[in-house]
UniProtKB/Swiss-Prot annotation:
It catalyses: O-phospho-L-seryl-[protein] + H2O = L-seryl-[protein] + phosphate; O-phospho-L-threonyl-[protein] + H2O = L-threonyl-[protein] + phosphate. PROSITE patterns: PPM_2. Belongs to the PP2C family. Mn(2+) 1 binds at D91, G92. Residues 64-314 form the PPM-type phosphatase domain. This is Protein phosphatase PTC7 homolog fig. It comes from Drosophila persimilis (Fruit fly). Mn(2+) 2 binds at D91, D236. Residues 40-83 are annotated as: Disordered. GO terms for biological process: dephosphorylation.
Length: 326
C-alpha cells in the first residue's frame, strides 16, 4: 500500500521544545503559534464627469458610493486576540440615494463588528453571530440608521488553525495556497447586481418593498489553513474589475512572505490596479462579461466602484514559556 505525504496543517506543525536552563531558571519551552500578518487598502469610486454609468435602471443596478475619505473605513481588522484574528469588509448599497437616504450612515456598523469581536464572549467559530449582533444593534437604535450593506467577515481560530467565514451579498473572500485558489466565496444575489444585503428600512414603510435579508442567510464555511496561505477579503469593486488569474499573478510574489511592509505593498498594488481597470472604457471586465451573460445592456469597460481589500498571510511565531523548577 502506498502512502501520499501531504503538507500538514498548522495544528500538526505546532512543536514544543524544552531546554534546561540551570538551577533557579528551570525548564523553558518553545512552541509555534499561527497568526495573520494583515494589511488594508481602499480606493473610492472616481467622480469624473466623463464616466458614464452602465445602462441599467436604478432598480436593477444599485450604485455604491462613499466619500474619498471613507473607503478604507468600510474594512475592519481587529487587533489580534489570544485565540483569533478577525477581519472583514462592509459595503453600503447606494441605491438608497434616489430616495434621499445616505447609505453611508450604515457603514459605521462595521466598526461595531470590531467592538463586538473584542468581547470575551466572542466565538471565533461563529462570525455569522458577529453580523447578527451588529445588525441587531443598528435596528434597536432610538434613531434607526437607514440603508443597507453587504458584509463579509472571516475569523482565524488559532487553536484549530481554521478559518471560519460568513458572507452575505457580493463582497467576499479568497484563500490562496501555492499560487492557486483553495477556496472562494460565491456571491449571493436576488438577481444580477442585486446582492443580498442587511437592510434597515424607514420605519413607516412597507417592509415588503425592500430586500431585507437576515444575517442567518450568510453563507458560513470552515477551512483549515497552512503556513504561507494568503487570505483576501474584499468588496465587489475588486472582483467586478479584476479576474481571478490576474489577482493570483499579482499576489504570487508575496506567497510565503510574512513581512507586514511587503503585504501592505502588495495590497496597495492590487487596489491601484483594480482602480485603473475600473475606469478603462475598453476593458472587458468580469462585471461586463457577467452583464452580457445576463442580457443586461452594458456599454463595456470596467465598473467604477469603491474598492476595499484586506490581505493577510498565515505565519508562525515562536512563543517562550518558563517553568519554575529548582
Amino acid at each position: 500500500m502506498a502512502f501520499m505525504r501531504s503538507k500538514p496543517s498548522l495544528g500538526s506543525l505546532a512543536r514544543v521544545a524544552f531546554r534546561w536552563c540551570g538551577p533557579g531558571v528551570g525548564l523553558v519551552s518553545y512552541s509555534q503559534e499561527p497568526y495573520l500578518v494583515k494589511a488594508v487598502q481602499g480606493k473610492s469610486k472616481p467622480r469624473s464627469p466623463h464616466l458614464t454609468s452602465p445602462q441599467c435602471s436604478p432598480e436593477h443596478r444599485p450604485r455604491r458610493f462613499r466619500p474619498p475619505s471613507a473607503s478604507g473605513r468600510t474594512a475592519f481588522s481587529s487587533a489580534p486576540r489570544p485565540k483569533a484574528d478577525v477581519m472583514g469588509v462592509a459595503d453600503g448599497v447606494g441605491g438608497w440615494r434616489d430616495r434621499g437616504i445616505d447609505a453611508r450612515a450604515l457603514l459605521p456598523g462595521s466598526d461595531r463588528c470590531f467592538v463586538h469581536a473584542q468581547k470575551p464572549t466572542f466565538d471565533a467559530r461563529n462570525p455569522r453571530q458577529l453580523l447578527s449582533e451588529c445588525y441587531g444593534e443598528m435596528k434597536r437604535k432610538w434613531k434607526p440608521i437607514l440603508g443597507s450593506s453587504t458584509a463579509c467577515v472571516v475569523a482565524f481560530n488559532r487553536s484549530e488553525s481554521a478559518l471560519y467565514t460568513a458572507n452575505l451579498g457580493d463582497s467576499g473572500y479568497v484563500v490562496i495556497r501555492n499560487g492557486s485558489v483553495l477556496d472562494r466565496s460565491e456571491e449571493q444575489t436576488h438577481f444580477f447586481n442585486m446582492p443580498f444585503q442587511l437592510t434597515v428600512p424607514p420605519p413607516d414603510s412597507n417592509r415588503e418593498m425592500w430586500f431585507c435579508d437576515d444575517p442567518s442567510e450568510a453563507v458560513a464555511t470552515r477551512l483549515l489553513l497552512q503556513p504561507d496561505d494568503l487570505v483576501l477579503v474584499a468588496t465587489d469593486g475588486l472582483f467586478d474589475n479584476m479576474p481571478e488569474q490576474m489577482l493570483l499573478e499579482m499576489l504570487s510574489k508575496v506567497q510565503g512572505v510574512h513581512e507586514q511592509k511587503a503585504i501592505q505593498e502588495a495590497v496597495n498594488r492590487v487596489v491601484e490596479r483594480a482602480g485603473a481597470l475600473s475606469i478603462n472604457p475598453i476593458y472587458k471586465s468580469p462585471f461586463c462579461l457577467r452583464a452580457l451573460e445576463n442580457n443586461v445592456p452594458y456599454g463595456g469597460g470596467g465598473k467604477p466602484d469603491d474598492i476595499t481589500v484586506v490581505l493577510a498571510s498565515v505565519a508562525m511565531t515562536p512563543v517562550q514559556y518558563r517553568g519554575g523548577f529548582q
